[in-house]
């Protein structure tokens, strides 16, 4: 049985304590996964945040650290807790109360979507779930933790920007949503400054509505310890053509914004940390 690929880790090459996370852009579907897809590959691709890994290229080229998940969200969702399992989708799992996301098919292993219905021909064996957790989910979070802890030990502060995309918004709706779990995963000034930088770049922005942040920012954000985590959601209409897969004329603009956020927020963290260290 082949191993799942490890997360792609880009080490820092600049002196700003910012780590980018891209958990939902994996496109590495194995033969076994596709063979079990009840509605074909397209049904699994609808779970992706298309090309968000490529949106991060400018920031990575500028030296920012990043962790990118090559394994598709359909296989296992790194933005869910290990316990968010739909027992109807996994064999050998005892029925237990589940959260609303797992109940609606979008738990640790997605089982159905509103558009395509049931995703899998057969239930996934519990041993396979354990394999995915051990080879995909945990290594991703270990890489995030290691990067953030290293930054915090060097600079006294660290920031995680967890990058996602959202379905096209209606005309006039914000193209960007910044999530900080209602002030629990980052200091309020961090998300406020992220919103300001996005507005200065010409985007309409909302805070925590409708996406307040998932398991990644909830797990890794510890603002009381100087480790901040925000979720960045960009509307797909801002960087993709109408087919939802092809980069549009706005692609480079969004890539530039991610670099701007990393630079501006990273410098702001250092500016705040230095006076505190001198006291």
Language model feature labels by segment:
Residues 1-160, 166-230, 234-279:
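N-terminal catalytic or cofactor-binding beta/alpha core of small enzyme domains
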């Amino acid at each position: 049985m082949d191993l799942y690929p490890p997360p792609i880790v880009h080490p820092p090459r600049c002196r700003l304590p910012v780590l980018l996370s891209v958990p939902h852009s994996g496109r590495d579907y194995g033969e076994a996964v596709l063979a079990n897809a009840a509605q074909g590959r397209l049904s699994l691709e609808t779970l992706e945040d298309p090309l968000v890994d490529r949106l991060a290229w400018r920031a990575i080229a500028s030296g920012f650290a990043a962790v990118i998940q090559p394994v598709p969200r359909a296989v296992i969702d790194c933005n869910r807790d290990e316990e968010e399992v739909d027992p109807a989708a996994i064999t050998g799992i005892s029925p237990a109360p589940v959260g609303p996301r797992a109940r609606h098919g979008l738990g640790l292993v997605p089982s159905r979507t509103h558009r395509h219905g049931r995703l899998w021909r057969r239930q996934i064996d519990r041993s396979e779930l354990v394999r995915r957790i051990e080879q995909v989910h945990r290594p991703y979070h270990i890489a995030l933790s290691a990067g953030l802890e290293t930054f915090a030990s060097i600079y006294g502060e660290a920031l995680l920007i967890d990058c996602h995309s959202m379905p096209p918004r209606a005309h006039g709706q914000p193209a960007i949503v910044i999530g900080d779990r209602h002030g629990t995963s980052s200091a309020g000034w961090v998300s406020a400054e992220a919103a300001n930088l996005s507005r200065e770049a010409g985007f309409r922005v909302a805070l925590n509505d409708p996406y307040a942040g998932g398991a990644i920012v909830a797990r890794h954000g510890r603002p009381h310890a100087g480790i901040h985590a925000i979720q960045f959601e960009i509307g797909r209409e801002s960087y993709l053509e109408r087919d939802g897969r092809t980069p549009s004329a706005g692609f480079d603009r969004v890539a530039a914004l991610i670099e701007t956020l990393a630079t501006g927020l990273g410098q702001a963290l250092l500016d705040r940390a230095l006076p505190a260290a001198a006291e």
